[in-house]
Amino acid sequence: MTRADLNMREIPKRGLEMKKEQVVEEVLDRIDSKELVQLALDLGNIDSPTGCEGEIGEFVYGWLQQQGFAPRKLGLFRNRFNVVATLPGNSQGRGLVLNSHMDTTIAKEEIWTTRGAADPIFHSAWREGDLLIGNGICNDKGPMAAWLIAAKALRESGVRLKGDLILTAVVGEIGLEPVDEFQPPEYLAKEAGTRYAVTHGAVGDCALVAEGTDFGLVWVEAGKAFFKITVFGEDVPLYTPYIQRPTPIERSPNAIVRMARLIELLEDWAHEYEHRHRYECPGGVVVPKVNIGAIRGGVPYKITKTVQQCAIYVDVRITPAQNPLDVRQELRDLVSRAGLNGEVELYVYRRGYEGQRVEPLAEAIQRAHQQIFGELPKVAPAPFSSMWRDINVFNEVGIPAITYGPGASVGGGNFAMRIEDLVTAANLYALIALDVCNQQRNAA
């Protein structure tokens, strides 16, 4: 089925009968906007950079207990656990997983990626008029608060769903990937989060990953391949007084200087690469971008000799159709074309996926969206489907997954979310759960 098919055809009214409209009203009336704002701020004011999710995990666990749920801690590490709770159905309907991540993108000491790494906007949250401000609000505690409040409303309403509603607040969605001396357990992310939760029982018939898409539908995401590209200088380091100039960049005795030539070529290659590998499907458009995220060479306390080796660390996004070994070969060819002696190491590979059999969930989202907005959801812009999100984990294991939520990604510089959008999201998540979890489950 194509997106056009979904958009053009009449969406069947299944899951909720007309006589149950009063149930919908009962649930939505229980969504308290003030409570939602306070929960989002409480979550946003717990600093939780990747690897330090213990405090927020305890908060979510305690909040769910207070609301009458029976949460579980599912963790690869004792101090970094996922929180899972279930609003049980009667086993006749579809099970829906709601998913958001608790970790945030910036630790205070990360001054070499973000000059203002300790700034409050990355570690706290506050209200300004009709906006909630903060990195954590947008990614991903605001959407999480929305479905937590929706789940509370469903439980308090007394409605009995046919299928389970599974709530998953996870760690490690934002990748800290092991490389060089940076090794687990301190440097390990995605294996501890949604993947661990799913492989330890947090499964349903479909999954809605609540992250910012500006309320557009996305069921494809890019994968990623991380490469360490090392360039070598001369066999014998030269003391500064012995350096000869002029020398062509690629012939410099200093590997750092030689790397400048490769970076120039890599930037040109990246532009061509993203156009050559553009991937379009009903679930979205993947434009695989490339970024040089780190560089190492020499030591700052001893700079009196030329450097024999310099490495760059390159984030290459890949589509569901690509093989990372093909990308590695292209990078090796680039090093050769630069006339450099070097090596290319693939140190992370996480495949991207296009969701399959997503129609029941997609149609439920469309019904809810149309009920709230009076129109069908639009196609989400390409950046929303060109990044890593945990729908990849669900789609990999055969659980049809879609990303759908309020606001935009902080990756583009957005650090504010409208309160109105959060309240709308809570209403939408409640409607979607009522719909999906009241659909008859058919055995695969």
What are these regions (language model features)?
Residues 108-124, 176-197, 239-251:
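Charged, glycine/proline-rich intrinsically disordered loops and linkers
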Residues 140-226:
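Acidic/histidine-rich catalytic neighborhood of metal-dependent amide-processing enzymes
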Residues 128-130, 150-166, 269-276, 436-444:
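Phosphate-handling active-site elements
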